[in-house]
């Protein structure tokens, strides 16, 4: 079984942490001034210390000048006890900045999971109009602050720009940057305590300030409130001297999250908590576009939920939206397929964080629990490094604290695209954790050396195949987009197909093979022509291998339908000779006739007919035609469970209705010109099957029955439900 192996590193010197000496996967810092403990209480503490030092994990912190790391960490822990952290931002993989409500700016320097330097900057303390900061934006050129009680924004501009590549300069204090402070009035409630949030685009020339909607009866001091005052989302621009409000809008529903697009810097993405006509909870994924410094809503996608949304997150490519609900359900909406997946978490999903690679997502609760899902919402077990291998569905952090401390923030340690682009092949295995009133820490994912520390989609599928969890691997492959991840999709598909072709063919594995190849041949949306041209030949090779695999297990009907789509004469001749050996004379005659037809067509055209070039658009007619299954058995189960196991999660997929943009492709050479030939083929097809109902698998792996009447162009009762090879 696949599971995540982790280590927990808490940056704390407090003795209130309850970490046993046998917890070899949990580390903290120890103070030299601590009294020695008895050997009976901590019998293995010395062995754990030797283990930590052998891995270059410091057991005690040094206090040398000028850093004085031990004293700085104690000061940071005291600050977290008395002030609220309003911003946690990773400038790079090694630099983290924390801003507290009192104006204290803390910079952390990391080396792996360990602290190297802590710089506490109090330059802004006492210089602001309020010590109740709501949110902040930190860049190399300026800082923007919003306040809870003041209807103003603070703009702090630096005369000297910090060098993004110089780590030492990044840890310098603000006083060395010669900054200038200015304040700007903004619309909205003036005498109300409101959480005003901030977001900035990747080009750093636009920003938004937003807050939750207020009720209409909250304006007793003004008889009529203007539309500008009723707005809850502001578009901000930068001038020579500071900020200006370019546009203001009022969202239709209460926003849960607002941010700029990473690929579209002038589009604002919002997630709003809405209700349907029947008062059912929903989530609206909206896109606002900035046109001539005005915000306009250009798109709204409504996602049905089981209960009210409390958290949300998007993947790095912004084509998947994950929503956590009050009933512990997790909803994942895939934009490129137009489907919705559902899973039930073992905790309250108050926090959601998606890995930068898009392979896994983490769901956390305020009670200090953590659960891992893959991008298809299959749960992945997790455990801390220990002597025994006992992975569980959730990871509990509260048991390490003698006091009640809730998990309030978690984030993968990776630089945002706003500041620098992630390097290709860069390892991302650290999850930053912040607990209310402390401590801080990281969760280190030990990914191993075979995958070079990577945690991508291909790496996840390799691990699933290694553990023979084919169902989970196929689900991840189905969630991938061939148009944007073509090479990764092909590697993943070939890995799954190769694994299945090495094993004995069963109805379950046959369905898994069809679902894997169906991600290319039967996508939910037609693939781009460039994608089809790039991968049709290598994927077609695996289709031929599947054909011979079907013949090896005497699956003549499926092999015949596959050969029809490939359109190669040698495949029909293989069926012909094998059918003769098995005594299937009717099938042998049909296959021979098909081979002769291909010969005639190739002679007339002057080239060998290799199959239709644009038959991918006909895959909705079905995939692998089980109307030709033997009597007394259905080759497809209701689900696609992995071999020897059943899926532990529930996936609900919904495809919104909409007009199809598939082109209708006429199939040639399917209708015989003479009525006598049609009757002969009807009799021969009847020898292969007597079923008129086709059971097919759609692109999402859901079983469906096709009761559509056969076209008059079909050959007798032999329903041609094809792969649609390109």
From Swiss-Prot:
Return the WD repeat spans: 305-343, 344-383
Q: Give the GO molecular function terms.
A: phosphatidylinositol binding
> Residue spans with biased composition (Basic and acidic residues)?
701-712
Entry-linked Pfam families: Frtz (PF11768)
Q: How does it assemble?
A: Component of the CPLANE (ciliogenesis and planar polarity effectors) complex, composed of INTU, FUZ and WDPCP. Interacts with CPLANE1.
Gene Ontology terms: biological process: auditory receptor cell morphogenesis; camera-type eye development; cilium assembly; cilium organization; circulatory system development; digestive system development; embryonic digit morphogenesis; embryonic organ development
Q: Where is this region: Disordered?
A: 642-717
Q: Which UniProt keywords apply?
A: Cell membrane, Cell projection, Cilium, Cilium biogenesis/degradation, Cytoplasm, Cytoskeleton, Membrane, Repeat, WD repeat
Q: Which GO terms describe its cellular component?
A: axonemal basal plate; axoneme; plasma membrane
**Protein's job:** Probable effector of the planar cell polarity signaling pathway which regulates the septin cytoskeleton in both ciliogenesis and collective cell movements. Together with FUZ and WDPCP proposed to function as core component of the CPLANE (ciliogenesis and planar polarity effectors) complex involved in the recruitment of peripheral IFT-A proteins to basal bodies. Binds phosphatidylinositol 3-phosphate with highest affinity, followed by phosphatidylinositol 4-phosphate and phosphatidylinositol 5-phosphate.
Q: Where is the composition biased (Polar residues)?
A: 642-660
Read off the InterPro entries from this record.
Frtz, WD40/YVTN_repeat-like_dom_sf
Q: What is this protein called?
A: WD repeat-containing and planar cell polarity effector protein fritz homolog
Quick check: keyword rRNA-binding in the entry?
no
Q: Where is the composition biased (Acidic residues)?
A: 672-685
Family statement drawn from the similarity comment of this UniProt entry: Belongs to the WD repeat fritz family.
Q: Where in the cell is it found?
A: Cell membrane; Cytoplasm, Cytoskeleton, Cilium axoneme; Cytoplasm, Cytoskeleton, Cilium basal body
What gene makes this protein?
Wdpcp
